[in-house]
Every structure is written in structure tokens, then in C-alpha cells.
Amino acid sequence: MKAHKTVFNQHPLSLNKLFFVLLLIFFLPPASPAASVNGLYKDSQQLLSFKAALPPTPTLLQNWLSSTGPCSFTGVSCKNSRVSSIDLSNTFLSVDFSLVTSYLLPLSNLESLVLKNANLSGSLTSAAKSQCGVTLDSIDLAENTISGPISDISSFGVCSNLKSLNLSKNFLDPPGKEMLKAATFSLQVLDLSYNNISGFNLFPWVSSMGFVELEFFSLKGNKLAGSIPELDFKNLSYLDLSANNFSTVFPSFKDCSNLQHLDLSSNKFYGDIGSSLSSCGKLSFLNLTNNQFVGLVPKLPSESLQYLYLRGNDFQGVYPNQLADLCKTVVELDLSYNNFSGMVPESLGECSSLELVDISYNNFSGKLPVDTLSKLSNIKTMVLSFNKFVGGLPDSFSNLLKLETLDMSSNNLTGVIPSGICKDPMNNLKVLYLQNNLFKGPIPDSLSNCSQLVSLDLSFNYLTGSIPSSLGSLSKLKDLILWLNQLSGEIPQELMYLQALENLILDFNDLTGPIPASLSNCTKLNWISLSNNQLSGEIPASLGRLSNLAILKLGNNSISGNIPAELGNCQSLIWLDLNTNFLNGSIPPPLFKQSGNIAVALLTGKRYVYIKNDGSKECHGAGNLLEFGGIRQEQLDRISTRHPCNFTRVYRGITQPTFNHNGSMIFLDLSYNKLEGSIPKELGAMYYLSILNLGHNDLSGMIPQQLGGLKNVAILDLSYNRFNGTIPNSLTSLTLLGEIDLSNNNLSGMIPESAPFDTFPDYRFANNSLCGYPLPIPCSSGPKSDANQHQKSHRRQASLAGSVAMGLLFSLFCIFGLIIVAIETKKRRRKKEAALEAYMDGHSHSATANSAWKFTSAREALSINLAAFEKPLRKLTFADLLEATNGFHNDSLVGSGGFGDVYKAQLKDGSVVAIKKLIHVSGQGDREFTAEMETIGKIKHRNLVPLLGYCKVGEERLLVYEYMKYGSLEDVLHDRKKIGIKLNWPARRKIAIGAARGLAFLHHNCIPHIIHRDMKSSNVLLDENLEARVSDFGMARLMSAMDTHLSVSTLAGTPGYVPPEYYQSFRCSTKGDVYSYGVVLLELLTGKQPTDSADFGDNNLVGWVKLHAKGKITDVFDRELLKEDASIEIELLQHLKVACACLDDRHWKRPTMIQVMAMFKEIQAGSGMDSTSTIGADDVNFSGVEGGIEMGINGSIKEGNELSKHL
């Protein structure tokens, strides 16, 4: 007690405080509970007010009642008798965010607010007008529809202690200009992933907001581009920039000592990483997947790195020795899809913590490093596929008890599959892929010891013997894939016990005996593929119980009997191939009652290839669908030893159908059987059917009109049957039909004259009693056959012959007359327009045209000043183009633009073309489209991309162009790693001149002139000689004619290329094209894009060059050009002056493209330019052209000697 008195005497103020506390405790005990109750009551009222403001939904927040305390409300947690946490994730609130800021943010003791996926909308700005509890430090608003600029984040300044903010998966835009003030709070966690943030250098904004204390920062899944400045976030431990459009070198860090997680995957980062990460000592996760990094793998922090993903780059050399330093810590290592070579070092075996190693799709070679790999005691996933390893597969892998996935596919492994691969009963092997190797011998019975096995693929080997019945004990097996081996014997009945089985693929073996009816017990089966064997017996009707069955392939066997009507109960069936068997009886109508369902697992995690047959006599059936995972496409030649077909086309991948109509079948091949009777009319309900082959049977009767309902059919083969009657007119509605074969039947009457029948060859109708085009047999006008009618027929034929003869004679006179007129007209035109003659280049540079292609009869929209149109524009069917692009698959996509997507395709004649699939248009512009196509198709010049053909069906419009090897100038110049070539100055100069020449041709040689309207670097394509070809000329005019939904601004250019006068009036002119060309020329000189916020901020390339014109102008040139050859600086300046003349704000002061060519010739005369970009005298002879800018020998522009005046 004395001690306490001493303390009190020393601190009298403390004594007073203690006395006050004692008063509160002993004399006012009810006060504190009352305060808590009052506070809780206030919280309850605010929460109930929030509920009352929500849309009236009975099930929403049902237990938020005034009769219960808020601590028992759904999603509410309390601490110290106050609401401290609210989590309404996945609650369909359907309100504006302002309600949240009005009722929830002000809760005074709230620490955490989670409204993830709560259907919130509106902007963040309402937060600035509300109050915020001082304890609130975490807000999660992910997966809503909140919009507005991300600069609205500053509205949370009222929440002074806010540390974590999650705004991922919303619709936020780049920061607005009006709210770039610094925030009054310091975030540690900021998640902006999956928003609409694009085209903005975000890091300076983050710094300006004062978020320098960030520890977690995610921008994943946006559209950010440009360069990245040096990052200065000393506390940053997690940085995710994946799935953006960054195209720059590896980012540098001022201080990365705390960085633990770095994800740059799925961008376009390029170059050598160097030593950028050497000081990141705590880095444990590094993902550089799917970029364009090159060179050697750099030295990485070895003390802490656990997860390293380098997949999909261009790293080269042998296995990186520096990775040996990581062995103590690395858990997952992915080096796949690179260019590593050599042998795998023994040091990999020292990585005792390694759980995943993927070195697939490289060029590793040598003997399979068995001893090294067998040391990886913790390994779970081992993927070594698509390399060049040799040797055998050892038993020692059975010691890897944690191994779940072993993928050795597509190597050169030999020997037998070891019997002891799963000898330890504790094994955990789930996936075994050994396909596309050179294994021989039997499938070991001991594989049944792999009790956890889910997927087994041994296809594309040389395995012999029978399928072990012991495999029936693998109760978890989903995939049994053994195709293209030499397996014999019967399909084991024991497979009926594989209750999880989804895919049974045994094609191209020597299997015999019947199809086990007991397979119907495997109710999850999606795919049964038994084709190209020696199976016999009947198709089990019990297969109709497989409601998930999507693909049934039994072709090229010796199966007999009827087609079971029960197969119609397979309501998910999309592919039925029974060709080349001994099936008899009729086609059962119940076969066509599919519901339109499809098994999801069919299209999950699988790779498919469809091989279209060539149609030769030895080749039966329409084609073959194969599971192609883990197999090199070039290995398809091995199929030819078992299959007598030459493949006309190979399709990879498959698009999941979306069924809105009745039926789901897309492929039906019953050809080469002994079927009889008529075609069931129910077949016409198969709306999605793409391939129908009933050829080489004994079917009879008339072709039903209902087949006109097959709106998606592309191949129709009814040949070699006994069909009679006429060809139904309903078949003319099959607009996607690309191939038809009605030959060798008893059909009669006229072949329909309309499309698509006017595009098929005559042999497709041969050996019938048909008449009309394309057969050489004309049709008579009526059925009468009496003598009088016969005589009239002779007279009509004689008259017709006379008319034809007179017509031919008259045509010859007309042709001679037209030639004389053309010659005289041409002479006068040469005298009047001598300056323009050189641009004629009057020869077509399209070598892929075919003389058999048909003329169209559309009226021309323009009078084109050309000597001749040597070959008619090609008209192609939609089916042709659908086939050539594999159904417009993403693998064929090479570019996208304002008018549509562009696909690379190979047509049936072998020509490689580019197909532009235009945006959908209304039918109102059909006539205009045809007219414009005929016009554009006649424009031929060596610096223009020629239009080869077109197709129109429904709302689809497709244009076929000559394919340009190197793509667009934009890609080559600004995305060099994608194309793989570097443009030096001579190449750029050649491109500049070629593009100018092509544009000049459009402006001065087409009457009336063609205004491009969208001249830009992405519309300058480069052929195999890097010759510039201007593309998309006439597109804006075409789209305008077709009444599309594009805005006027879209039709008048692309931002960065649009001349200033277009913003006052959308009246386009050739001088507008000249301005746009000037921007392209600046791109060639500077190497920069016309709009890049990282380089120019709110400015653009033209404005940026203007600023430099007041200082050291040479700073604008691409440094790489001057590094290569400093002597070209004068020439660059001369070309810059040309660009400046084109970019004059006063459109009447700009030169014409003819004058631009004259300037280039003037520069050429004084610089000794190489022959690749030589300008001929005719290119610049413009007598009669209105006056304009003159250019002196030294390149000075006499309209204004100071460069800045032209800017």
C-alpha cells in the first residue's frame, strides 16, 4: 500500500485519472452496457433501413428483423456488442452502390465489408458524400457491375484507415482527368483485375494517388499496354500484370527486396530478362508464361523460388544450369513450349521438393534420363511429351509413389511397356500417356494394378496381342484410348465394369468378334469409336440406353443386321458413322429424335482431328473423327498404312454446338452398306446436320422435300442408289451446301438452275436421266412427243442454232468494234493523262485466280480506268470458306479490324488466301455489296491487295484476298516478336514508297477517284518481298453502301490517323488520305504508334513530333535506325519533311500523292537509293496535274523552309 501511495504522490494526475475510473466502475455501472445497447440498436436500425431500401424480394435477407438482434442477421458478425463485419457475397441485392455508402459505410464499428457478386451497379463517387467508420479497413466489391473511372477510388478518402480494396471483375475504366488528386488513405491491397482499364500507363497514376505502400497489386485481365516505368513500391510483395497487352521489355524494380509473387503471363513482353530479378531475394512465384522472351534463362533468386513458369516463350539453349541452384526450393517447374535442346542434366534429380515438371514441346533429346527422374520422390506431375527422347520406359518409375500424371507422348521411346509400372499397391498414378511412340509387345496385365488410373492412352504405337480383360477392374477409368495399334482378339466383356468410362477409342486395330452388348452398362460413355477393325455381328440395341452417347463410330467393319431404332434414344448423339459394313433393312425413322443435348465431358480437355476423305473409289466414307491428344499431326502418314484414303483436309479442334432447334446430329454416314427403302422424312428435321452420306446403298423412292430442312448441311451424298423422280426444289434453300453427289440413280427432270446447283460439276449428276446445266443435255420445254411437236422441236432447234450463229457473228463484230474504240480512247487518254499511265501497272498480280471462275452479272458502281480485267472475280460458296477456315476457328484467325475478322485459309485448289468476314449487315445492301465487289475486284496494282473473290449468304459477307506473308506493317513495326523480322531503313523506305504508290493509284487512276478513308499501318500489308500492299481500299464506301451499324466516325478513319478537318465535317477527301499517309510515314521514321499514352500522354504521335520540332528534331527518329547507320540521318530528315507536308493542318496545302512520289524521287536522285525502292520516271510524271509543292534537290520544301512551319 505504501508503494502505491508513493506512486500516486509522484503522479498526482494519474491519481485523478484512477479516481475518475473508479467512479465510472462503482457509481455508474449501468452506463457502459446501455451505451453498447444503444450502439447496437443504432446498428440494427441502419441495417434494417438498408433492407427497406432494397427491391422487395421475399427471400432476400429474410431474418433481418427488428425482433432479433443484428448479430444474428445473415452475413453479419459482431465484436464487443457492435456490428464489425458484413458479408453479403452472392446475395442478389440489385441496387446502386449509393445505397451501400448511405447505410453500410457509416456503421461506426465496421471493420470489414464484403459485397462480392451482389449485383451492385453505379459508380464509386457516392462514397465521397458519405461518412465512414474509422475502423473500416477492408472493402470487397468484386464481381459486380460498378462502372466509372478508377480515379473514383479517391472517393474512399472518407475511410481514412482503409487498407484493402477489391474492385476486381467490374467495369471500371482508365482514370479520368478531373480526379487525379492524391488519396487521403494509404492502401496496402488493391485489386483491379478484370475491368475495362486500357491504353493507360497506370503506374504513375498509382504513385500520384499516394499508394506507395502497396503490398498487393493486381491488374490482371485488363487491356493495359505500352511501356512500364521503373517500379518504386518498396513494400510490394504481390504483383500480377497477367492477361494484358503490355508489349515492352521486362519491367525494372527500384527495390524488389520484398517481392514474393510476380505474374507477367499472357502479354507480349519481349527481349532478354537479364539480371532484372537478381535482387529479388524473397521471390517465390514467377510466371512468365505466353510472352516473347528470348535468349537464355537468367539467374534467378535461389533462396526462395518455389514456382517457376516459363511456358510459351522463345528461351533457347540447353537445359539451364542455373536452374540447378533452385533445386532446394523449387516445387513446380514449367519450361514447356520453348526451344530448349540437348539432354536433361542429372542435377534435375536433386530437386527433392519438385512436384511438377513440364518440359514438353521442346527439342530435348538423348536417352530418357531414367535415373535422374527416378530420384524425384515427391513428383506428382511429369510431362516430357513432344521431345525427341529415346530409350525405354523403366520399372523404376513405380517407386515414385506420389506420381499422378506421367506424359511421355510424342517421343521416340521403344521397347515394351514395363509390367511393373504400378507394382507398388500404394501407387497413385491417375494419368498415363504413352501415345505416339514406338512401343511394341502386349499391353501388360499388371496395368490393372494402377487402381487410381483415370486416363490411359497408348494409341499410335505398335502394340500387339489382346486387350487385357483385367483392365475391367479399373473402376475410376474414364478414358481408354488404344487406337492405331496392332491389337487383336475380341473386345473384353469385362469392360462392362468400367462404370466411370466416358471414352472408348479402339479404331485402326485388328479386333474381331461382336460388339459387347454389355457396354450399355457403362452409362457415362460419351464416345465409342471402333472403326477400321474386323468386328462382326449386329449393333447391340442396348446401346440405345446410353443417354450420354455423343459419338458412335463403327465404320469399316463387317457388322451386319439392321440399324437399331433404339439408337434414336441416344438423345445426345451428334456423330453416327456406320459406313462400309453389311447393314441391311431400312433406315429407322426413330433414329432422328435426338433432343439437342450434348454431354459436357465430350468437349472438355480433348483434342480432336477430323480427316476428310478424298472421295476415291478405294476410300469409303466421308471422313474420320479421331482423338488426337498427344500426337504430332505430321504422324498422320502412319494412318495410310491402315486406311486407303488420301486426306484432302485435316481439321483440328471442335466447336461446341449450341442447339436451339430439334435434333443434335451433325454427322451421319451410312454409306457403303445394303440399306433399302426410302429416306425417312424425319431426317429433314436434323437442323444441325452438316454431313449426310447415304451413298452406295440400295435406297429407292423419291428424295423427300423435307431434306430442304437441313439448313446447315455442307456435304450431301446420295449417289449409287435407286432414287427416282426429280431433284426437289427445296434443296435450293441449302445455302451452305458445298458438295453434292446425286450420280448413278434414276433421277429425271431438270437440275435446279439456281444456287447452289449452278456451282457443282457435271459428274455429280451423271448416270441419271437429268438435263440442264451443268450437264451437256438441254431440257425440252414440255413433255409432248407427237410428230408435230417433234417437227416444231426441230424447227426451234434450227432456229436456235441460227440465232446462236448470228449471235456469235454479231458478237465478233461488237468485239472488233470495241477493240477499235478502246484503242482510240486509250490513245487520247495517253495524250491527256500521260502523268498517270505508269500507275496502271495494268497486269493482275494475282496468281491464284482460276480461269474457270464465273463472271457475275452485277452492274458496276464505278468506271475503272483499266486496260483489261483478265480474270473474272471468283464467287465462292459459304461452305467452301467454312471448310477452308475450319469453321472460322480461332486457329485460323490472323487479325481483326473495324470491318471484321481476317482468317488465313487454303482453298481446294491449294491457293492460300486471306478471308475477311465482315460485320453482319442488313439485307438492304445486297445489291450495293455485289456492285462494290465487282468494282473492287477489278482494281489491280502491285501495291494494292487484290480481291480474289467473295461470298454472300444470309447476313454473312466474306471477301477473299491474296494472302500476304508478313501481315501488316503495324505488326511488323510494333510487334516485332510476333512476326520475327526487323525492318532496317532500306526496308522501311521501300514500304513508304510502295504504300504511296498504291494510294496514288487509287487517287489518280480510278475514275471517279477512290478515297481510302482509313489509311493506317494495319492496312499496309507486306508480301514475301516486303513490298507494301494497301488493303481495305473501298471498304468504308462498301460498308456505307450496305447500311451497316457502323458510325460515321468509324467509316472516316482511325484515331491517330484522322485529319483535323474530319472533326468539323465527316466529308472525306483524298487530302484526308494524304494526312493519314503522313502518319504512317511518321511511324516508319519514329518506330512509334500513332496513339500511345505511355509515350505521348494525352497527345499523339503528330503532336509529339511537333513538340520536338522546336528542339532537336533528330530525337524523334527510331534509335535503332541510327544505331545501324548514322549516315542516314540526312535522308531521314528529308523523309520527315515529306511527312510534315502531308500533315499540314490546312488540307489545301497538303501535296497530292503524285506530288509525294515526286518528292521521293527527288530524294532518291540525291541519295543513291538502292534498286529495291527505285521510283521510275512515270511514277512522278504529272503533267496536267494542278500545281502544288515543289521540292529542291536538297529536300527543302519551298512552301516553307523551316520544318517547324510544316508542323
From Swiss-Prot:
Changing H1012Y: In cu3-abs; brassinosteroid-insensitive semi-dwarf mutant. GO terms for cellular component: plasma membrane. It catalyses: L-seryl-[protein] + ATP = O-phospho-L-seryl-[protein] + ADP + H(+); L-threonyl-[protein] + ATP = O-phospho-L-threonyl-[protein] + ADP + H(+). The active site is at D1014 (proton acceptor). Glycans are attached at residues 119, 166, 196, 235, 245, 287, 339, 363, 412, 449, 521, 556, 584, 646, 662, 724, 746, 767. Coiled coil: none annotated. The chain crosses the membrane at residues 803-823. Its main location: membrane. A motif (Cys pair 1) lies at residues 71-78. One of its GO terms (biological process) is defense response to fungus. It is a single-pass type I membrane protein. ATP binds at V894, G895, S896, G897, G898, F899, G900, D901, V902, K916. The keyword Transferase applies. Pfam families: Island (PF20141), LRR_1 (PF00560), LRR_8 (PF13855), LRRNT_2 (PF08263), Pkinase (PF00069). Keywords: ATP-binding, Cell membrane, Glycoprotein, Kinase, Leucine-rich repeat, Lipid-binding, Membrane, Nucleotide-binding, Plant defense, Receptor, Repeat, Serine/threonine-protein kinase, Signal, Steroid-binding, Transferase, Transmembrane, Transmembrane helix. LRR repeats lie at residues 109-131, 135-157, 161-181, 186-207, 213-234, 235-257, 258-280, 282-304, 305-325, 329-350, 353-374, 378-400, 402-423, 428-450, 452-474, 476-499, 500-523, 524-547, 548-570, 572-594, 664-686, 688-711, 712-735, 736-758. It is found in: Cell membrane. Its EC number is 2.7.11.1. A motif (Cys pair 2) lies at residues 771-779. GO terms for molecular function: ATP binding; protein serine kinase activity; protein serine/threonine kinase activity; signaling receptor activity; steroid binding. Residues 1-34 form the signal peptide. Receptor with a serine/threonine-protein kinase activity. Regulates, in response to brassinosteroid binding, a signaling cascade involved in plant development, including expression of light- and stress-regulated genes, promotion of cell elongation, normal leaf and chloroplast senescence, and flowering. May be involved in a feedback regulation of brassinosteroid biosynthesis. May be also involved in the perception of systemin, a peptide hormone responsible for the systemic activation of defense genes in leaves of wounded plants. A 68 amino acid island between the 20th and the 21st LRR is essential for the binding of brassinosteroids. Belongs to the protein kinase superfamily. Ser/Thr protein kinase family. This is Brassinosteroid LRR receptor kinase.
